[in-house]
Curated annotation (Swiss-Prot):
[4Fe-4S] cluster binds at C128, C215, C312. This is Quinolinate synthase. GO terms for molecular function: 4 iron, 4 sulfur cluster binding; metal ion binding; quinolinate synthetase A activity. Iminosuccinate binds at H62, S83, Y154, A155, N156, S171, H241, P242, E243, T258. It comes from the Bacteria. One of its GO terms (biological process) is 'de novo' NAD biosynthetic process from L-aspartate. The keyword Ion transport does not apply. It comes from Neisseria meningitidis serogroup B (strain ATCC BAA-335 / MC58). Keywords: 4Fe-4S, Cytoplasm, Iron, Iron-sulfur, Metal-binding, Pyridine nucleotide biosynthesis, Transferase.
Amino acid sequence: MQTAARRSFDYDMPLIQTPTSACQIRQAWAKVADTPDRETADRLKDEIKALLKEKNAVLVAHYYVDPLIQDLALETGGCVGDSLEMARFGAEHEAGTLVVAGVRFMGESAKILCPEKTVLMPDLEAECSLDLGCPEEAFSAFCDQHPDRTVVVYANTSAAVKARADWVVTSSVALEIVSYLKSRGEKLIWGPDRHLGDYICRETGADMLLWQGSCIVHNEFKGQELAALKAEHPEAVVLVHPESPQSVIELGDVVGSTSKLLKAAVSRPEKKFIVATDLGILHEMQKQAPDKQFIAAPTAGNGGSCKSCAFCPWMAMNSLGGIKYALTSGRNEILLDRKLGEAAKLPLQRMLDFAAGLKKKDVFNGMGPA
């Protein structure tokens, strides 16, 4: 770990950066459908399977959505993954229609990368607190105040914010990309997640100014309560997503993206794990490691509000009924202005090219923004 030349919290950030309102969160939870009974779920799955074939469509799902949807995606030749894996899969798959089960920025990313494809979502109102907390006009004005800095934004942002950026990153490749930019002597603006940005700042020593957004799920994990839980289970491996507060990250044995945490849960020899991320990931962890025990990290305790209780309300808005509706009606389609999509594709494609190079262990030269 290195010491950053300029830390995020040394800077007086814009007042526009307010937490996602309790009203928005309540509205999201109010739209979450009841879990269907077994007979109804089986009927819906059969109908969706037929519709996917009929429409030349494929289901692309995030680890945080309903386990019924995750299983259906895999059963039909689709994808279950983190946001990087979803973007890569959608761009490479031959299907003419992508049904993206996740939150809106994921559907937008699919459309940005595949403008010729139809991109549908179970519910277009499935937002993300990070996206909501980073409005394009305010973020762009902040960037304009620091024209000498390279703008790096997390994938959890709107197409308009991506279009303002030089690089888009996911938690899977953020450390590597920021390290690369630091090696080029670049100073950065990072948005919107302050916890992930601060973690990267501390790990790389990069000169970063951070937008002060946060994820309502990961922001609720509590360091003091996690330490107490860890003391109760000293043999457990603590898995932490870096969108969590620093006090939680410091207790992690493994810190990384959902895919990295899943890989650790499956590959490590230990039999007990404490998991500090959205509990939707536990379904795939338990499937791939049925002999292991997974314990949810605490979100309650001192100062706890449990707005999410480790479940994203917008991810929970995805339903089998919503998928069927999108496929039968053709509605809930992601539509983007062509010029906006082209501008947003440049930093997003830059990340995918970088990630592909990492996979091949290539050496990168001259990949900075033009």
